[in-house]
UniProtKB/Swiss-Prot annotation:
Bilayer topology term: Peripheral membrane protein
Record's protein name: Protein transport protein SEC23
Positions contributing to Zn(2+) binding: C56, C61, C79, C82
Cellular-component GO terms for this entry: COPII vesicle coat; endoplasmic reticulum exit site; endoplasmic reticulum membrane; Golgi membrane
Subunit structure: The COPII coat is composed of at least 5 proteins: the SEC23/24 complex, the SEC13/31 complex, and the protein SAR1.
Keywords, alphabetical: Cytoplasm, Cytoplasmic vesicle, Endoplasmic reticulum, ER-Golgi transport, Golgi apparatus, Membrane, Metal-binding, Protein transport, Transport, Zinc
MF terms in GO: GTPase activator activity; zinc ion binding
Entry similarity comment: Belongs to the SEC23/SEC24 family. SEC23 subfamily.
Localization per Swiss-Prot or TrEMBL: Cytoplasm; Cytoplasmic vesicle, COPII-coated vesicle membrane; Endoplasmic reticulum membrane; Golgi apparatus membrane
Organism: Lodderomyces elongisporus (strain ATCC 11503 / CBS 2605 / JCM 1781 / NBRC 1676 / NRRL YB-4239)
Presence of the UniProt keyword Transmembrane in the record: no
C-alpha cells in the first residue's frame, strides 16, 4: 500500500512510516516523526457504528476497542496501547473470527460512532455585518447572506449584529417592529455589562422535564424567560421572513465620513459583543460568528489604523521595525477574544470584501485557534467571495452540513511514543497525560485539543517523540489512536476513531524506505511557519537551510569533499526542491505581500492536507500543444515556449498562459475558422481543466487568463525556477523571450540548479 492509499483509508500521512527504535536515533533523523491527520476525511465506505464505543478500563489509557486488539474466547480483550486486559460487554460475548463486531474488523482502522447522547441545541450562526461600505458592495453581501439561508438546517439558530460607528444587536424575537440594542463602538464591554444592557439574565438550557415544568409556571415567569438573551438567536424556520426583510432594509452606516478620513468602524467592539453574547447564551454548543468586514477597524477596542487617511496602515516593515503603533494592542485584544471563543467552543469566520487590509494579521488567532475560515476578496461582489462563502455550507449525500462543531481531539499512544505537540487550527486543552513529551513542538504540553470547528478539509500536523531508550526486537510495533469527538449537524454527537500501527526499527535502510518526502515537506513547512510567527525571517530561513543540509548529510551517498559524488535515493530526491520552492514561497518571502495576505496564505496552509499543501509550496505546471497530449512540465523558465499553452495551479491562483505564437493566432481569431478546429480545441483544453480545478477548491482561486508580455504574466514568472535570467550566459534560445531555451526571468533569485550546487558543496564538506 502506498502512502496516498493509506491516507485515503485513514486520513493519516506520516513523514516516516517507521519510527527510530530509540530516542537517540530519533534525534538524528532531522525531519520530525510527525503525521498529517484529517479527522473527518471523507470515505464512501466509512464504517459507521450506531452505538457507543468500548473503552480501555485503564484510566491513564482510555483507548477505544480497535482491530489491533487481541480478543480471547473468555470475553476479554487486550489493549495494544497499554497492554491492559479488559472485559468485553456482555453483548460481545461469543464473538469469533467469523462474527466480529464492526470495530474489530480489519477494515475498521477508522470508524465513526454515532453516540446515544443527544445534542441539546442545533448549530448557531451569528452574522456580523459591516455597514461602512458602498451600497453596491453591501447589497451584494446581503443577497449572498440571504441565499445562505437555503443551505442552513431549518432548525439552526440565527442571530444578526450590524456595525458601523455603533454596534446594533438585532432582537429577532420582536415580531411587530424591528427592535435593536445599540452599543458604543469605542467601548469594550464586559460580559456582565452586555447582559445587563440587554436587560435580562441568561436563560438556562432546559431538558424535556424542565420544559414541561416551565409550561406550568405563571405567565409572568414565562414572559421573563421570553425576554432572555436567547431571543437574539432564534430558529431560522421561525424568523427567516423577518430576518430577510431586516437584511433587505439595511443601509450604509449613516455616520458622516469627513474628507481625508476613513469611516469610523467598530469591528473590535462588534466582535466583542458577538462573542460575549454567544458565550453568555450558548456556552459549550456549536456556534459560528461570521464577520463580514469591508475595511479596517478605526475605533478602539481593536483599532487597526487611525481614521485619518494620512496615517498609512502598517506594513511588514513597520511591524519588523516596531513602528506599527497599534499592532501589539490590537493583537492582544483579538487574542483575548479568541481565547473566550475557544473556551465556549465557538468558531469565528472572517470574510474580507475590500481592497484595503482589514487587520487579518491582528485577528488571525480568531480563526486559527477556533478552526474558522479566513477569506480575502477584493469586494463582496466578486465570484471569489460569493462562491467561496456558499461552499462553506457544502453538504454530504444525506443533506447534512460538512462541518463538525464543538469538537475535541485526543491522541493516545503506546509506551514507545509521546506527544510533542500539534500545528494546525486548534487550541490546547492543557491535558498533560502520561504520554505527553517534555520536548514541545508546535502547540505542546497536552494530548487533548479543542476543535471548535472541523471539516473534511481540516488537517492537523501531530508530532511524536520516541520515548524508548533501549533497543527493541525487529518486530516491535508502536500504536497511535486519534479520537475526535464532535457535534454533527444532524443533531448527534459522534466519535471518529483512527488507530494505526508503525514498526520501530534501528535499521537505517528501513527508515529510508519509509520516508514520505511529500508529507515531510508539508510537515516541515508547518514547522517553519510556526517558527516564523515567533522568530526573525532571516533566522528561520537559515534554520530551514541547516535542516536540509543535516538531512542530506545523514541520508545522501557521497564521498567527503567530492561534490560530483553526491547522490540522493529516490525517497529523498524531490525533497530539496520542495524546500527550495518553500524558501521562495509567499509563506516565507513576504516582501510583495501585505501582512493580511501573509496571514491568509499561512492560515490556508495550516488547514489543508498534504496534496493541496504541496501545490501551494511547489505549484503544478501543465503544458498543452497542438501535436501532443497535455503533460506535466518543469516549474521552470525553460518550460515557456512560443507554441505552448501553460496551466499553472498555485492553489490560490489558476493561470492560463499563452505562448507568443499561440497568442498571435488567438488575436488573429484562427479559432473561429472551421479549418482550425484543432486550434480551437487546444484553446479549450486548459479552460476545461481549469474549470475542474475551480469546481471543488476552497477558497475559490483567482482565475487569470494571460499571454506572453501580458501584465499578469508576472504571476507565472514569480513561481518559475529562474534557470535563465537576465544575468546568465547559459541561454540556449538567444536573447529573445520564449525561444527554444525558454524565457528570461528578470530576477536576482538563485536558481534551483545553483541552490542544489551549493547544497552539495556544503554537504560533502561537512559544513552545517
Amino acid at each position: 500500500m502506498n502512502f496516498e492509499e493509506a491516507e485515503d483509508i485513514n486520513g493519516v500521512r506520516f513523514a516516516w512510516n517507521a519510527f527510530p527504535s530509540t530516542k537517540a536515533e530519533a534525534g538524528k533523523i532531522v525531519v520530525p516523526t510527525g503525521a498529517l491527520y484529517t479527522p473527518l476525511k471523507q470515505r464512501e465506505d466509512l464504517p459507521i457504528a450506531a452505538y457507543d464505543p468500548v473503552y480501555c478500563s485503564n484510566q491513564s489509557c482510555k483507548s477505544i476497542l480497535n482491530p489491533y486488539c487481541a480478543v480471547d474466547p473468555n470475553g476479554f480483550w487486550r489493549c495494544p496501547l497499554c497492554q491492559g486486559r479488559n472485559s468485553l460487554p456482555a453483548h460481545y460475548h461469543g464473538i469469533n473470527a467469523e462474527n466480529l463486531p464492526l470495530e474489530l474488523q480489519n477494515t475498521s482502522s477508522t470508524v465513526e460512532y454515532i453516540t446515544a447522547r443527544p445534542v441539546q441545541n442545533p448549530p448557531i450562526f451569528t452574522f456580523v455585518i459591516d455597514l461602512c461600505q458602498d451600497e453596491e458592495n453591501l447589497k451584494a453581501l446581503i443577497e449572498d447572506v440571504i441565499v445562505s439561508f437555503n443551505y442552513l438546517p431549518p432548525n439552526a439558530l440565527v442571530g444578526l449584529i450590524t456595525y458601523g460607528t455603533m454596534v446594533q444587536v438585532h432582537d429577532l424575537g420582536s415580531e411587530k417592529i424591528n427592535k435593536s440594542y445599540i452599543f458604543r463602538g469605542d467601548k469594550e464591554y464586559t460580559d456582565k455589562q452586555i447582559s445587563d444592557m440587554l436587560n435580562r439574565p441568561v436563560a438556562p438550557v432546559l431538558n424535556q422535564q424542565q420544559q414541561q415544568q416551565q409550561q406550568q409556571q405563571p405567565l409572568q415567569q414565562q414572559q421573563q424567560l421570553a425576554n432572555s438573551l436567547t431571543r437574539f438567536f432564534l430558529p431560522l424556520e421561525d424568523v427567516e421572513f423577518q430576518l430577510t426583510s431586516l437584511l433587505e432594509g439595511l443601509n450604509r452606516d449613516p455616520w458622516a465620513v469627513a474628507n481625508g478620513a476613513r469611516p469610523l468602524r467598530s469591528t473590535g467592539s462588534a466582535l466583542n459583543v458577538a462573542i460575549s453574547l454567544l458565550g453568555l447564551t450558548f456556552p459549550g454548543f456549536g456556534a459560528r460568528v461570521m464577520l463580514f468586514a469591508a475595511g479596517p477597524g478605526t475605533l478602539n477596542p481593536g483599532l487597526i489604523v487611525g481614521n485619518q487617511l494620512k496615517e498609512p496602515i502598517r506594513s511588514h516593515s513597520d511591524i519588523d521595525k516596531d513602528n506599527a503603533k497599534h499592532f501589539k494592542k490590537a493583537a492582544k485584544f483579538y487574542d483575548a477574544l479568541a481565547a473566550k471563543a475557544v473556551k465556549n467552543c465557538h468558531t469565528v469566520d472572517i470574510f474580507a470584501g475590500c481592497y484595503d487590509q482589514i487587520g487579518l494579521l491582528e485577528m488571525k488567532n480568531l480563526c486559527n485557534n477556533t478552526g474558522g475560515t479566513m477569506l480575502l476578496s477584493d469586494a463582496f461582489t466578486t465570484s471569489i467571495f460569493k462562491r467561496s462563502f456558499l461552499r462553506l455550507f457544502n453538504k454530504d449525500e444525506e443533506g447534512y452540513l460538512l462541518m463538525g462543531f464543538n469538537g475535541t481531539f485526543e491522541i493516545r499512544t503506546s509506551k514507545e511514543l509521546k506527544v510533542s505537540g500539534l500545528i494546525g487550527n486548534a487550541s490546547s486543552l492543557g491535558v498533560k497525560t502520561s504520554n505527553v513529551s517534555e520536548n514541545e513542538l508546535g502547540i505542546g504540553g497536552s494530548s487533548h485539543y479543542r476543535l471548535c470547528s472541523t471539516s473534511p478539509r481540516h488537517t492537523y500536523a501531530v508530532f511524536f517523540d520516541v520515548a524508548n531508550t533501549q533497543q527493541l526486537p525487529p518486530t516491535a510495533q508502536s500504536y497511535i489512536q486519534f479520537i475526535t469527538h464532535y457535534q454533527h449537524s444532524s443533531g448527534t454527537y459522534r466519535i471518529r476513531v483512527t488507530t494505526v500501527s508503525n514498526y520501530l526499527t534501528s535499521d537505517e535502510q528501513s527508515l529510508t524506505n519509509s520516508f514520505d518526502q511529500e508529507a515531510a515537506a508539508v510537515i516541515m513547512a508547518r514547522v517553519t511557519i510556526f517558527k516564523s510567527e515567533q522568530d526573525d525571517g532571516a533566522d528561520v530561513l537559515r534554520w530551514v537551510d541547516r535542516m536540509l543540509i543535516r538531512l542530506c548529510q545523514k541520508f545522501a551517498d557521497y564521498r567527503k569533499d567530492q561534490e560530483e559524488s553526491f547522490r540522493l535515493g529516490p525517497q529523498f530526491q524531490l525533497y530539496p526542491q520542495f524546500i527550495y520552492y518553500l524558501r521562495r514561497s509567499q509563506f516565507l518571502q513576504v516582501f510583495n505581500n501585505s501582512p493580511d495576505e501573509t496571514a491568509f496564505y499561512r492560515h490556508v496552509l495550516l488547514t489543508e492536507d498534504a496534496n493541496n499543501s504541496l501545490i501551494m509550496i511547489q505549484p503544478t505546471l501543465t503544458s498543452f500543444t497542438l501535436d501532443g497530449e497535455p503533460e506535466a512540465v518543469l516549474l521552470d523558465s525553460v518550460s515557456i515556449k512560443d507554441d505552448r499553452i501553460l496551466l499553472l495551479d498555485t492553489f490560490f491562483h489558476i493561470l492560463i498562459f499563452h505562448g507568443k505564437t499561440i497568442s498571435a493566432w488567438r488575436k488573429a481569431k484562427y479559432q473561429e475558422q472551421e479549418e482550425y478546429a484543432n486550434f480551437k480545441q487546444l484553446l479549450d483544453e486548459p479552460k476545461q481543466e481549469a474549470a475542474e480545478l475551480l469546481a471543488d477548491r476552497y477558497p475559490l482561486p483567482r482565475f487569470i487568463d494571460t499571454e506572453e508580455g501580458g501584465s499578469q504574466a508576472r504571476f507565472l514568472y514569480s513561481k518559475l525556477n529562474p534557470s535563465v535570467t537576465y544575468n546568465t550566459n547559459e541561454m540556449i534560445g538567444g536573447p529573445g523571450m520564449g525561444g527554444a531555451g525558454g524565457a528570461i526571468v528578470l530576477t536576482d533569485d538563485v536558481s534551483l540548479q545553483v541552490f542544489m550546487s551549493h547544497l552539495q558543496k556544503l554537504v560533502v564538506s561537512g559544513s552545517s
